[in-house]
Amino acid sequence: MGKSVVILGAQWGDEGKGKIVDLLTDRVKYVVRYQGGHNAGHTLIINGEKTVLRLIPSGILRENVTCLIGNGVVLSPAALMQEMGELESRGINVRERLLISEACPLILPYHVAMDHAREAALGKNKIGTTGRGIGPAYEDKVARRGLRVGDLFNREAFAEKLKTILDYYNFQLVNYYKAEAVDFQKTLDDVMAVADIITGMVADVTTMLDKARKNGDNILFEGAQGTMLDIDHGTYPFVTSSNTTAGGVATGAGFGPRNLDYVLGIIKAYCTRVGGGPFTTELFDEVGSEIARKGNEFGAVTGRPRRCGWFDAVAIRRAIQLNSISGFCMTKLDVLDGFDEVKICVAYKMPNGDILDYAPLAAKDWEGVEPIYETMPGWKENTFGVTDVNQLPEACRNYVKRIEEVTGVPVDILSTGPDRVETMILRDPFAA
């Protein structure tokens, strides 16, 4: 029997999902994106060569894997063409191995314009979006006015819908935000220039996945961003616009929830966050700066520096609840090499003195929260590239074990470097 495995971020994104997806795709026939858009950069390093994928599933680098983009993904034709071009210039066959749901909402230039206009208007109170039109595209989906991949099959009908929605957006852009209008004809021409390429990759993703499951094929679902950025369960309003949790697989790919066998939560050995929003364990001292430097904590897509802090078991417990996490993959363990001590946040102290074991839901409920830490001895030895768990320093192994104890979830995979070979698989998700 085949296995269906979800890989998702259990923190605030940037946990290293792309590498782990790539690592495990030698076991699968299908890799599926089910939410988000080209706002998430998945960085892969294979034999020293760096690849950043934003929209196309990471399995595209394995020639025997078919990649699917489910209906929960918002798709930018421009971003898709750019990414396909980058991959095809390296000899990677994309068009015959990438299939797209016709129900994917389209991201078009007016979404990007609105994203930028809103963030500029918010000033210091901005959400910290990537400015790629993700949120406005999801808004159109929920408002039932958005254009979808399936609309590309009919140019006349597409043009008519585009005119109506562009009038709606341009009125706001010009009159409220004092921004420039988006040109109708250029938008139409640019999209129609690539319409045949995109429609040529359209498939019934739900039926394909159902057949694959019944055929006993292994399927891997690739999440983007992280659990604490989920539109419903994250630190609202400092969240993304999609469901980043395991439930997104059912709604964003049309795959029944009872058919999932294993949920792999990706966690860093510490925590990072990009943009605004609560971050209880954030470090503002030299330790935080050193973690950022050693971990090269800058966004793969935006280049923005990431905020860094100690491991937060309280937030992780919420992620476990939301996702039914089967096991963890801990990445960037080597970044903690050399510190005299390492810390784990095991509880939150509220301003009224209450102790919380699970993270609050809304951002406002995090105000004044203080972390309660357990402090453990650090290790001076170099763990970069270690591939045998018994070669890790005892203090390092104790740190991993303690995280397992305070979360109640085993660490099944350990990563000690960016290359796919710099990994220890203690329990294979497809054999679990």
Curated annotation (Swiss-Prot):
Pfam families: Adenylsucc_synt (PF00709). The active site is at residues 14, 42. Plays an important role in the de novo pathway of purine nucleotide biosynthesis. Catalyzes the first committed step in the biosynthesis of AMP from IMP. IMP binds at residues 14-17, 39-42, 130, 144, 225, 240, 304. PROSITE patterns: ADENYLOSUCCIN_SYN_1, ADENYLOSUCCIN_SYN_2. One of its GO terms (molecular function) is GTP binding. Its EC number is 6.3.4.4. The keyword Nucleotide-binding applies. Its cofactor is Mg(2+). Pathway: Purine metabolism; AMP biosynthesis via de novo pathway; AMP from IMP: step 1/2. SUPFAM superfamilies: P-loop containing nucleoside triphosphate hydrolases (SSF52540). Binds 1 Mg(2+) ion per subunit. One of its GO terms (cellular component) is cytoplasm. It comes from Pasteurella multocida (strain Pm70). InterPro entries: Adenylosuccin_syn_GTP-bd (IPR018220), Adenylosuccin_syn_Lys_AS (IPR033128), Adenylosuccinate_synth_dom1 (IPR042109), Adenylosuccinate_synth_dom2 (IPR042110), Adenylosuccinate_synth_dom3 (IPR042111), Adenylosuccinate_synthetase (IPR001114), P-loop_NTPase (IPR027417). Belongs to the adenylosuccinate synthetase family. Mg(2+) binds at residues 14, 41. Keywords: Cytoplasm, GTP-binding, Ligase, Magnesium, Metal-binding, Nucleotide-binding, Purine biosynthesis. Homodimer. This is Adenylosuccinate synthetase. Substrate binds at residues 300-306. GO terms for biological process: 'de novo' AMP biosynthetic process; IMP metabolic process. PANTHER family: ADENYLOSUCCINATE SYNTHETASE. It catalyses: IMP + L-aspartate + GTP = N(6)-(1,2-dicarboxyethyl)-AMP + GDP + phosphate + 2 H(+). It is found in: Cytoplasm.
